[in-house]
Amino acid sequence: MALNFPNIDPVIVKFGPFDIFGQTFEPALRWYGFTYLVGFVAAMWLLNRQADRSNGLWSREQVSDLLFYGFLGVILGGRIGYVLFYHFDYFLASPMYLFKISEGGMSFHGGLMGVITAMIYIAWKQKRTFFAVADMVAPVVPIGLGAGRIGNFINGELWGRVTDVPWAMVFPSGGPEPRHPSQLYQFALEGVALFLLLYWFSKRTKKVGAVSGMFLLGYGIFRVIVETVRQPDAQLGLYWGFMTMGQILSVPMVLFGLYLILRPEGKQ
């Protein structure tokens, strides 16, 4: 007996239509974008709170700078990563596919690379070490991750594999078979559990880079676990018959995260 998908309208409210220069526009506020907005505001509040308690190491102005470039990194990196990692064939056939953002498609691993690029720039601009910036940012990242997974669930996308567990759901775009609600698993692990883990760990270590390492380790492990029940991307399938692209991209995160946590104290 499968649970019914709640079928929440992905659009909260529509505006218009508006006719501009002969073109009709009907902008809309969607739950997917709204969840990210809520996540961004919550992350901003927490970062400002951390800055206020940093004994002058961070100012709110510096946090605003970090958020601005971090946001750009997430959007640009997430889109580029999605196209290169998951739809490279589309890009080769039509490079303009990269700019078709309205069709959806973001990659966490691409967004991570974008954020890393932004943090390198902020570290240079504010004359800090890279990990001084990364350790500041890492504890709030799960907020955005969790918000995004709720958006995925409302959209009825990125569902799991066919299953007979009691909480399985039939998704409108997933066929008649009941499936794992893998978006909710990711919300619970990558959002809630990872946030609590990083909050706890950040209070118990002063080692430079360790909090960043715990984020990489925790996210990588959680992603590898959930990918075992998440439906593989249709255009990619499984590599070597058992690994998804998400798992392949997460394994280096686990290894580098372990290195950052276990490396000798003081080594940069």
Curated annotation (Swiss-Prot):
Keywords: Cell inner membrane, Cell membrane, Membrane, Transferase, Transmembrane, Transmembrane helix. GO terms for biological process: lipoprotein biosynthetic process. It is a multi-pass membrane protein. It comes from the Bacteria. GO terms for cellular component: plasma membrane. Its EC number is 2.5.1.145. It is found in: Cell inner membrane. The chain crosses the membrane at residues 27-47, 66-86, 104-124, 130-150, 181-201, 208-228, 242-262. Its main location: membrane. Pathway: Protein modification; lipoprotein biosynthesis (diacylglyceryl transfer). GO terms for molecular function: phosphatidylglycerol-prolipoprotein diacylglyceryl transferase activity. InterPro entries: Lgt (IPR001640). NCBIfam families: lgt (TIGR00544). Belongs to the Lgt family. This is Phosphatidylglycerol--prolipoprotein diacylglyceryl transferase. It comes from Shewanella sp. (strain MR-4).
